[in-house]
Amino acid sequence: PQSLINLAQYGEKYAELPILGAADYKLNYHAATGRAVYSFCMCPGGQVVAAASEEGGIVTNGMSLHARAAENANSALIVSVDARDFGANDVLAGVEFQRYWERKAYELSGEGYKAPAQLVRDFLKDRPSKDFGEINPSYRPGVVLREIKECLPEEVTAALREAIPYFAGKIKGFAHPQAVLTAIETRSSSPVRILRN
């Protein structure tokens, strides 16, 4: 919840001071494999929204309204990938890699455009989630409980499992056991690189 992030960032004395507004954060970590893991597009008092541009794929994104007054804080957790992950040398291999995982998320959902979601505690312990706790997912048209590792590359899953506890050491409550991971954010950067000159 946003209130937990406010408490962690501002401290008990100032957590509810209206003039400060909803707290944000920026986190980064380098996994043992060398992959970068970082928070992206942190939306204080925000929500997770649908952002698919193609049929049969799920893409999530985040946003905050002007007041930043929604009950949840959210951000994308991004893990770096590169041409070695794409499995091909074609100029559009990155686009196909992106589409593949977006389709996997759609298939995993099994319920149309509802996004796969899992509680942080269960993701870290590699077990399915049975129900939601006190944190209400904000994604519309809704979420379904699934093991999100099924729509992520193994290397990405491993890097996230390494980074989330580290982030929790930086921001108390970041890995709240009932926090919700909603999959999949694939559009943080372009899968095609154009070199100039």
How would you label these PLM feature ranges?
Residues 1-197:
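Residues forming the flavin
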